[in-house]
């Protein structure tokens, strides 16, 4: 008798993706983040759905509806903080997932990588719009500052900004449409994830050595299902520690003040996971230049497959490239720190140097070091 798992039209798709999937035998814990991102997305969609049941997207009532969720709804505070801190966990996993891809050369899977970059953009857009919804001071001013950047686009900029705002400033129309987009985008993310997995399963997973592993594959279940469960437990533990012990650790106190268009907060800054890009934006005195640098700081990921000149795929056996990679990580941490600092000496110059170094490492130093390593290995 044939196994239903292998013959049923729907179940066999799940079987080929999560059960009988041939997987390299040597993939490390760095390969756990795909499933953890899936879990984060599921948590965000579920908690977001319950929040949307009680939230009102009107400038007069948005802030008080969030207060109502936290005070009056059964476990509303838990749902709200799981959603807010779930976003932070989502981005931690995203950055680690992308970092893994860069370190082990996973970007040579061209389609998978590029859809991943698109996913990163869409998730960032979703998170930005979600931050606007509580309608606190930082929500309002963050939305004003970031949407205003589009006015730097020549000729159509101002019209475009007013079109996005639905008026002449961030107001009711803006909040309503941001809520609509924030609700629908995670489902688009889920669809893109399916495409991401589709392309990944065309080639199979990469592995730490960067070598072809077709001769040494093992089934995904039970080996990697059990390994993923460990990651899931650690992620949920970290999230719940954050939610239950210091839920406001990563938030901004200004967001507990209702939005006031007549009063600008002294330091406007986005959530921590955007600070590196915000620092790059601020480091360029020209508005259009800053916007281009901001976009290119993420878009540069699409260039990695083209800039890969090494004869080896992974950095596992390339100590010089490893050095450059960790320089890049340190630089990104520096940018994140600078993004949260006021615009004054010495932070301005540190931000400019760190921004310049970010692009220099990726566009110049990594390829150069790869060529040197090729020569050292007499290849």
From Swiss-Prot:
<dbReference type="InterPro" id="IPR048260">
    <property type="entry name" value="Cytochrome_b_C_euk/bac"/>
</dbReference>
<keyword id="KW-0813">Transport</keyword>
<keyword id="KW-0812">Transmembrane</keyword>
<dbReference type="InterPro" id="IPR016174">
    <property type="entry name" value="Di-haem_cyt_TM"/>
</dbReference>
<keyword id="KW-0349">Heme</keyword>
<dbReference type="Pfam" id="PF00033">
    <property type="entry name" value="Cytochrome_B"/>
</dbReference>
<comment type="function">
    <text>Component of the ubiquinol-cytochrome c reductase complex (complex III or cytochrome b-c1 complex) that is part of the mitochondrial respiratory chain. The b-c1 complex mediates electron transfer from ubiquinol to cytochrome c. Contributes to the generation of a proton gradient across the mitochondrial membrane that is then used for ATP synthesis.</text>
</comment>
<feature type="transmembrane region" description="Helical">
    <location>
        <begin position="77"/>
        <end position="98"/>
    </location>
</feature>
<protein>
    <recommendedName>
        <fullName>Cytochrome b</fullName>
    </recommendedName>
</protein>
<keyword id="KW-0496">Mitochondrion</keyword>
<feature type="transmembrane region" description="Helical">
    <location>
        <begin position="226"/>
        <end position="246"/>
    </location>
</feature>
<feature type="transmembrane region" description="Helical">
    <location>
        <begin position="320"/>
        <end position="340"/>
    </location>
</feature>
<dbReference type="InterPro" id="IPR005797">
    <property type="entry name" value="Cyt_b/b6_N"/>
</dbReference>
<dbReference type="GO" id="GO:0008121">
    <property type="term" value="F:ubiquinol-cytochrome-c reductase activity"/>
</dbReference>
<dbReference type="InterPro" id="IPR030689">
    <property type="entry name" value="Cytochrome_b"/>
</dbReference>
<feature type="binding site" description="axial binding residue">
    <location>
        <position position="196"/>
    </location>
    <ligand>
        <name>heme b b566</name>
    </ligand>
</feature>
<feature type="transmembrane region" description="Helical">
    <location>
        <begin position="33"/>
        <end position="53"/>
    </location>
</feature>
<keyword id="KW-0679">Respiratory chain</keyword>
<dbReference type="InterPro" id="IPR048259">
    <property type="entry name" value="Cytochrome_b_N_euk/bac"/>
</dbReference>
<keyword id="KW-0408">Iron</keyword>
<dbReference type="GO" id="GO:0006122">
    <property type="term" value="P:mitochondrial electron transport, ubiquinol to cytochrome c"/>
</dbReference>
<dbReference type="InterPro" id="IPR036150">
    <property type="entry name" value="Cyt_b/b6_C_sf"/>
</dbReference>
<dbReference type="InterPro" id="IPR005798">
    <property type="entry name" value="Cyt_b/b6_C"/>
</dbReference>
<comment type="similarity">
    <text>Belongs to the cytochrome b family.</text>
</comment>
<feature type="binding site" description="axial binding residue">
    <location>
        <position position="182"/>
    </location>
    <ligand>
        <name>heme b b562</name>
    </ligand>
</feature>
<keyword id="KW-1133">Transmembrane helix</keyword>
<feature type="transmembrane region" description="Helical">
    <location>
        <begin position="178"/>
        <end position="198"/>
    </location>
</feature>
<keyword id="KW-0479">Metal-binding</keyword>
<keyword id="KW-0830">Ubiquinone</keyword>
<dbReference type="GO" id="GO:0046872">
    <property type="term" value="F:metal ion binding"/>
</dbReference>
<comment type="subunit">
    <text>The cytochrome bc1 complex contains 11 subunits: 3 respiratory subunits (MT-CYB, CYC1 and UQCRFS1), 2 core proteins (UQCRC1 and UQCRC2) and 6 low-molecular weight proteins (UQCRH/QCR6, UQCRB/QCR7, UQCRQ/QCR8, UQCR10/QCR9, UQCR11/QCR10 and a cleavage product of UQCRFS1). This cytochrome bc1 complex then forms a dimer.</text>
</comment>
<feature type="binding site" description="axial binding residue">
    <location>
        <position position="97"/>
    </location>
    <ligand>
        <name>heme b b566</name>
    </ligand>
</feature>
<feature type="transmembrane region" description="Helical">
    <location>
        <begin position="113"/>
        <end position="133"/>
    </location>
</feature>
<feature type="binding site" description="axial binding residue">
    <location>
        <position position="83"/>
    </location>
    <ligand>
        <name>heme b b562</name>
    </ligand>
</feature>
<feature type="transmembrane region" description="Helical">
    <location>
        <begin position="347"/>
        <end position="367"/>
    </location>
</feature>
<dbReference type="Pfam" id="PF00032">
    <property type="entry name" value="Cytochrom_B_C"/>
</dbReference>
<keyword id="KW-0999">Mitochondrion inner membrane</keyword>
<keyword id="KW-0472">Membrane</keyword>
<feature type="binding site">
    <location>
        <position position="201"/>
    </location>
    <ligand>
        <name>a ubiquinone</name>
    </ligand>
</feature>
<dbReference type="InterPro" id="IPR027387">
    <property type="entry name" value="Cytb/b6-like_sf"/>
</dbReference>
<feature type="transmembrane region" description="Helical">
    <location>
        <begin position="288"/>
        <end position="308"/>
    </location>
</feature>
<dbReference type="GO" id="GO:0005743">
    <property type="term" value="C:mitochondrial inner membrane"/>
</dbReference>
């Amino acid at each position: 008798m044939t196994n239903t798992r292998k013959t049923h039209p729907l179940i066999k798709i799940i079987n080929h993706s999560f059960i009988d999937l041939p997987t390299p035998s040597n993939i490390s814990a760095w390969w756990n983040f795909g499933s953890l991102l899936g879990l984060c997305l599921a948590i965000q969609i579920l908690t977001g759905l319950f929040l949307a049941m009680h939230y009102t997207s009107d400038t007069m009532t948005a802030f008080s509806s969030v207060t109502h969720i936290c005070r009056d709804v059964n476990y509303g505070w838990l749902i709200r903080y799981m959603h807010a801190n779930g976003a932070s966990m989502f981005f931690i996993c995203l950055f680690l997932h992308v970092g893994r891809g860069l370190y082990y050369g996973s970007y040579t899977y061209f389609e998978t990588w590029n859809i991943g970059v698109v996913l990163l953009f869409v998730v960032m857009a979703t998170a930005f719009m979600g931050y606007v919804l509580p309608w606190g001071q930082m929500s309002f001013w963050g939305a004003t500052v970031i949407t205003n950047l589009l006015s730097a686009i020549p000729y159509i900029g101002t019209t475009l900004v007013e079109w996005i705002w639905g008026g002449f400033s961030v107001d009711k129309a803006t909040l309503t449409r941001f809520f609509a987009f924030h609700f629908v985008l995670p489902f688009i993310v889920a669809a893109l994830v399916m495409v991401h997995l589709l392309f990944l399963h065309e080639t199979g997973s990469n592995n730490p050595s960067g070598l072809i592993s077709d001769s040494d594959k093992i089934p995904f279940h039970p080996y990697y299902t059990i390994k993923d469960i460990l990651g899931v437990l650690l992620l949920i533990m970290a999230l719940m520690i954050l939610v239950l012990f210091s839920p406001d650790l990563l938030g901004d106190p200004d967001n507990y003040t209702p939005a006031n268009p007549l009063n600008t907060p002294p330091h406007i800054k986005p959530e921590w996971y955007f600070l590196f890009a915000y620092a790059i934006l601020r480091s360029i005195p020209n508005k259009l230049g800053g916007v281009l640098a901001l976009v290119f700081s993420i878009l540069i990921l699409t260039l990695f497959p083209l800039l890969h000149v090494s004869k080896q795929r992974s950095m596992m056996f390339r100590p010089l490239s490893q050095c450059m990679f960790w320089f890049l990580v340190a630089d990104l941490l520096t940018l994140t720190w600078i993004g949260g600092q006021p615009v004054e000496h010495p932070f301005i110059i540190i931000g400019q140097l760190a921004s310049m170094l970010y692009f220099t490492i990726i566009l110049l130093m990594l390829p150069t070091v790869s060529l040197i390593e090729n020569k050292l290995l007499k290849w």
